[in-house]
Regions:
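Localized sequence-composition bias
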Residues: 1-139
Length: 139
């Protein structure tokens, strides 16, 4: 069966970031017949398949206007506080009734590179956990 909606490309910009830097994910998609009310989902998983975070436009009250042809959905993360490693992006497109039209797991990968986030001379690594939580000590 020919799909009416297809994901044509997913790109993470940049492909490699240091802990604490921003990340933008572009989801390019093709709509063969005009429609509206498309909702987009994205999740980030680590190498073990653990879901680190997920976002769904339907939960945020956001859906597409009338679209046809090649279009783009963009999500921007101002700060990615993940510890070093490879992370995978899964994307999905649903219709207004939340029917899953497209779901592609691990369609894109990005790398997080170690950084001395506290200017202490120590690089954080996965012994610090999966994410780095901003904090301040008082002694």
């Amino acid at each position: 069966m020919d799909r009416e909606v297809e994901v044509t490309q997913v790109t993470s910009v940049p492909k490699a970031i240091f802990t604490g830097e921003p990340l933008t994910v572009d989801i390019e998609y093709l709509v063969k017949s005009q429609c509206s009310g498309l909702r987009f989902g994205i999740s980030i998983e680590n190498q073990l398949g653990q879901r680190i975070s997920a976002s769904y436009t339907g939960r945020e009250g956001i859906e597409s206007d009338d679209v046809i042809g090649i279009n783009k959905a963009v999500i921007h993360f101002p700060v990615i506080n993940l510890t070093p490693g490879e992370y995978y992006i899964t994307v999905a497109i649903h219709d207004r009734s939340n029917e899953n039209l497209v779901r592609i797991e691990r369609i894109e990968v990005f790398e997080v590179i170690a950084k001395d986030v506290a200017d202490s001379g120590y690089l954080i690594d996965q012994s610090s956990g999966i994410i780095w939580l901003d904090h301040k000590w008082t002694l």
